[in-house]
Amino acid sequence: MTSPMRHLASCRAVLLDMDGTLVDSGAAVEATWRAWARDNGLDPATVLAVCHGPDAATTVRRFLPGIGAAELARHVAAHLERECADIDGVIPAPGAPELVAWLDERRLPWGVVTNAHLRLARARLGAAGIEAPVIISFDDVEHGKPHPQGYLLGARRLGIEPARTAGVEDSAPGLAAARAAGTLVVAVGESRDGDVVCRDLHELRRLLIAAADRLP
């Protein structure tokens, strides 16, 4: 059994990032951050270069470092309203419907770990037609990605130890969180920083099927 197969054969649960991994929300994410940048006199291209992965508060603090707690909360709340209103064009990522259908068919526990607030996570997943049995959102943790708290909580909710859980991510903060939690790190997309590397969720599903078929 090859190394990726050996890794995946040990998995008994799957936790997936939302934006960029399970859901293609790129257009909506960029539109809302572009508008925020313009509202605050910032270069949209500079903001867009770093906004994928971190939670909204982290991005706001990065560009408005002297901001107080009340003003930060106002920015985050306004941004959340804009994000929840702008879900046009949010679609499932390539292979997402097929992967979650296979996980459900196999009765393999799975869920979503996201730096988005729960309200936004439900809106985007709903727009993409994906019903996640477990959602760990930014509202559930004290520290978002790259902190491992979300993945540790997700594994606990699924009832599977992190070492036997695949953490599927596309961004550097997410990959760092999945790794720090002790999960099997699956990098999807352009990143190569994973125990298993897949072009998309179609490929991940094929690898999971092959790994399951090779079990004794």
Residue spans for each PLM region:
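N-terminal helical cap/lid subdomain that shapes the substrate entry/recognition surface
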Residues: 4-106, 117-122
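Hydrophobic residues in well-ordered beta-strands that form the structural core
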Residues: 24, 112-114, 187
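Asp-based, Mg2+/Mn2+-dependent phosphohydrolase catalytic module
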Residues: 1-12, 97, 101-104, 108, ...
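Residue-level marker of regulatory loop/turn positions in helix-turn-helix DNA-binding domains and
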Residues: 92, 113, 143
